[in-house]
Amino acid sequence: VLRACDELGMLVWEEIPVVDLIALGDEFRANATSALREMIRQHYNHPSVIMWGYMNEAVIQLQYRVKKQRLNGFYENTLALARHLEETLKREDAYRLSTMAYHGNQIYNKIGLSNITDISGWNLYQGWYENDFKSFDRFVDEEHRKYPHRPLIISEFGAGSDPRLQSLDPQIFDFSMQWQQLYLEYYLPAIMKRPFIVGATEWNFIDFSSASRQEATPHINNKGLMYNCLLYTSPSPRDC
């Protein structure tokens, strides 16, 4: 994949699978450090890789899986691990940028996690999971107002759709093709007109497996711009 990206001139953000919840203990820290070091050493010579990542939505599960009285300990542990991984990354590759993706919650700013990497990545879904489209404008404008020095990437944005669902009156989270289209038609101009947003990635290119999801298509995250026709319409790959 990286060789194809090199040849096609595609830009790559590559990251290790440290996501959702940072475990306490030396074993987790050692494993994350090893994974980061291996990733950088294996792929250092690919010119398509422009940044390394080492956490994605790192505290999104804490409110559901950790008792309130233990939250501060987990926040401190996550912050310490992030600082350690940032130091490891810069020792391995002093030339590329570091990055981290956050879900749309101010806790990353509050605990200082968003101060560590070179680039801040926000996974934002206003108009899909929550609120309305204009909440996206308010979020990114306020973020830039408070932290004008930070390069900001919209590391994820997208809406789910099922090709079997069509609507003349599309609504938020209805999984119709029409709502996905409205979502993207709002987000793309909103991103492009803000020069402080230095990049954006639509999530996702194609529908993919997600075991825990029970939505329009069980076990599938269907935010893809393309879909697997075997899931919906065709009994045979030859018909796709």
What are the language-model segments listed below?
Residues V1-P151, S161-P170, Q214-E215:
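Active-site mouth of glycoside hydrolases
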Residues S98-M100, L152-I154, I197-T201:
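Acidic/polar loop patches that form or flank catalytic/metal-binding clefts of enzymes
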Residues F157-I172, R194-L230:
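Aromatic/acidic polysaccharide-binding cleft in carbohydrate-active enzymes
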Residues V140, Q180-L188:
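Short, hydrophobic/amphipathic alpha-helical packing segments
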Residues N72-E76, F173-L182, M226-N228:
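A short acidic, glycine-rich active-site loop
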Residues Y232-C240:
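Single conserved hydrophobic/aromatic residue that forms the stacking wall/gate
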Residues I40, L188-P189:
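Generic structural signal for well-ordered alpha-helical scaffold segments
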